[in-house]
């Protein structure tokens, strides 16, 4: 590694960590309706939205009403996006006259963007019109992270409130999350990207004559605005087929730094938002320490692995510094690994290098980041509510070990809460192991694998892990655009999204109804290094150990067989 690599890593952590406490407090004030510096500008817009939609902003909902509103909103969003993708050939803003997507691909794409996964079994510039990109995909890029943020806020209220029957208003939370939480930051990032050369235009694709005399089509479009929310909303779906490896999505080292840092900017800030809800920022610091520890362990492993020379070239005269297959030379190995680890630690899924070309252990780190439930920062809202589930599980295990009724911040965890926690633990195994095993055992679906042996199995394992974790990245050699995989990965995405959201909303309702006992000397502290260590071990054992046999058949076997 060179001095530039260390400067990149330092700048990344400074951009992410320095504004996090301030931004976390801002999100708390926004979601609770307190006045902020944006209120004079956006307050009238917010109130106008409520009047237009007929929403009574002062009327809160119980968890069942909140759940029904959330499901109805997401269902309507899915149907609208599905229709736009099917009918885009008949709709305006389609200068390339692209036809509508095939029905199973349209289903997969609509589910993907509604669930904040952004799995793409298509190439954007070749199959999606400008209107579909803006009216369909970009809209969901805003409302899907806003949904995750709303669910997180409900869980925070459930932990913080006492003897309460209501948890907020879904329509109010969605409006505030979108208007205050996402739009201003996206506007700023979009302007920075345009400054760096990312296109933002409605012009037709350009045509150029190459030096060889051939005609080349150069895709354009309103890219900067979608890329901004793609990164900040932990969406990840690229405007172009190769995502942020494309020079129009990510042209410079500066744009690369802005984009990779923006992936976890909001998820890190929301850790501090939780601390403001429970009036104890020590809880935030303990959770953030665990997240950073897991991130640094995975990142260090991936950097070491990816800087190893390829054993297959040792007998040749080729001088190896680091493997650059599948990477952009303008980003280098460290910039590519940093992105790969960050995008899988969050439920983002965007890429600036091809994950299918990563060394086996680097690919395994990416998979493990997803397999533990996307709790290492995770998606907007989704990452922290997933981490809080592990916090409650760790508290439950600690209670079993010391023979006391487990409680978290004065709220006792009883049978109903534990049952809901266990239900969430089944989400990833069902999506990855059950659906993945079925796909691997059927000759038709297994034919999507384009490599033999362990790496081929890793391709399939990565696909179903990515779908279940709502990540969206892929080993791109996997032939995902078949009716079977479009439907089954779509099912995995739905399980991975709503298999968490529904139990969490029920859990929030149950916790909110409880009284809060004052913390005493015998209470198990959840803000110190001991609990941080317990939480880390819980995540690795409960969340990760389940998948060790499949990892042994995939990336571990490949690593050993290649002689690294």
Curated annotation (Swiss-Prot):
Primary location class: membrane
Organism: Pseudomonas putida (strain ATCC 47054 / DSM 6125 / CFBP 8728 / NCIMB 11950 / KT2440)
GO molecular function: P-type potassium transmembrane transporter activity; potassium ion binding
Record's keyword annotation contains Phosphoprotein: no
Cellular component GO terms, alphabetical: plasma membrane
Membrane topology value: Multi-pass membrane protein
Protein name stated in the entry: Potassium-transporting ATPase potassium-binding subunit
Protein family per UniProt: Belongs to the KdpA family.
Family matches, as PANTHER family: POTASSIUM-TRANSPORTING ATPASE A CHAIN, POTASSIUM-TRANSPORTING ATPASE POTASSIUM-BINDING SUBUNIT
Short name of any one Pfam family annotated for the protein: KdpA
